[in-house]
Every structure is written in C-alpha cells, then in structure tokens.
Amino acid sequence: MVLSQMDAGKALTAAAARGNTSMVQRILEESRVHPDTPNEFSMTALQVMMMGNSKIASLLLEKGADPNVQDKHGIAPVHDAARTGFLDTLQVLVEYGASVNIPDKNGALPIHIAIREGHRDVVEFLAPRSNLKHTNISGQTAIDVARALCVPDMIDLLFAHIHS
C-alpha cells in the first residue's frame, strides 16, 4: 500500500472513525504516516476514532499521536471519552500523557462533562486526578455542576475526594 501523506492521513482517520483496528495498524505500519496527520477537515485519527475502541487509541499513541490535541472548540480526546463514558479509552489516553485538566473553550474539564453525562465510573477515575477547584466559564466547579444537576451520589463522591 503506497499512499501519499495526505491520502494516508485520510485513510487513517477513516479507519479510526470506523473502529477498524486492523486497517489502522496496517496503515501505520505500511505507509509510515504520522498518526497526527490530519484529514481534509483538519482532524487527526485520535480525534475522530471510535471512542469505544481503546486498542485504536493505544496503536495511535504508541506511534506518537498527541494525546492532548484539541479541535477548534478546544475539545480533546479526553473530553470525548468523558462525554461518551468510555473509561477504558480514557485510561489509555491518561496513561500516554493526556491531561485531565485541559479545558475546552467553555472552560469545562473532562470531569465537568462526565458529571453532566452521568458517567459515575469516569467521574471516580477523574476525581483524584482533576483540579476540583477549576471553574468553567459559568464559574462552576465540578461540585457545582453536580449540584446544578441534582446528582447527590456524584456530590458525595466529589466531596470525599476534596476532603481526603
């Protein structure tokens, strides 16, 4: 498979978006494309990958993908993993250096998003690693988001981490 860098970038992002692990691996190995090569929409494979496929995340990160790459809205893969609730993918991203304290353009950290989406296991993972005093553009901390959404179990979980 001989592809130009641009074509290889398109093929890589398409395979990652479809969750095609074997094709992602093949493109990375045979075309020697850098995993951060963007597609025609300026998105990398890590940004468009099927979040439920932690194996693809591992392949891309092992080959040097930037775990903190952000789109024009400040959304990083950790925000997407927190939003969709894929803890295994989030763990891989963090293992490879993704920051859990990277804000999007609204100032939301991944923990704010996980609380909003109701992903308790993700919140449990993020709480000891996150800056729980960080406020979004509305001035809300993670606990404030949980209070606004009336989720007492998340409020308790966050208080436990603050007072530990």
Give short role names for the model-derived ranges.
Residues P67, D71-Q91, E95-Y96:
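Eukaryotic tandem repeat interaction scaffolds
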Residues M1-A11, P128-S164:
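Ankyrin-repeat-protein effector appendages
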Residues A14-N20, V48-N53, D80-F86, I113-H119, ...:
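Ankyrin repeat A-helix N-terminal signature
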Residues N20-L28, N53-E62, F86-V94, H119-A127, ...:
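Ankyrin repeat structural motif
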Residues M1-E30, E40-M43, S164:
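Intrinsically disordered, low-complexity regulatory segments in ankyrin-centric signaling systems
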